[in-house]
Regions:
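Structured C-terminal cap/extension of enzyme domains
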Residues: 42-142
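Homeobox/homeodomain signature
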Residues: 5, 31, 110-113
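Hydrophobic transmembrane signal anchors and adjacent membrane-proximal interface regions, especially
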Residues: 1-2, 18, 112
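Ligand/cofactor pocket segment of small-molecule handling proteins
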Residues: 9-47
Length: 142
């Protein structure tokens, strides 16, 4: 039955990197562990995660690809700079509703999946305007 255990992927979505290290070490390091906090991907990568699952990868994957490539090349300054951009974006998402803001961003880049489901609500026009201005200021979507 070991082959069944090998098929499982485990998602770790906690900001506690000490606990992440403990999980990485479980089963002699043989777990397939995915990290679920986009704004801390580089830190988790340095600890040895196997991959990542996150919402901002849907619309900001080029940034994360560049960040991981820089990290693998040993260009920590570039990787850190790109990770800070992710941190800034996640911070903006958390100022409003992360899911509503993510839907807004997806629509902005051409993927309109409709409004969020109840009990969530879409951004109000004033929230949308402020959010768009903040996103423009980050200069992530050119």
């Amino acid at each position: 039955y070991q082959f069944l255990f090998d098929l499982f992927l485990y998602q770790f979505s906690n900001l506690d990197l000490v606990e992440l290290q403990r999980c990485i070490g479980l089963d002699d390091g043989n777990l397939n562990l995915l990290f679920g906090c986009d704004e801390m991907l580089m830190a988790a990568q340095s600890l040895g995660i196997d991959g990542a699952v996150g919402s901002t990868y849907n619309y900001l994957s080029p940034l994360y690809y560049r960040m991981l490539a820089a990290f693998e090349k040993g260009d920590l300054c570039e990787a850190q700079s790109l990770q800070r951009q992710s941190v800034d974006l996640v911070g903006l998402l958390n100022l409003v509703s992360p899911l509503s803001a993510s839907k807004s961003l997806l629509k902005r880049i051409g993927f309109d999946f409709g409004p969020v489901r109840l009990p969530l609500r879409s951004l109000t026009p004033s929230e949308q305007k402020a959010f768009d201005e903040s996103i423009d200021h980050l200069n992530l979507f050119q």
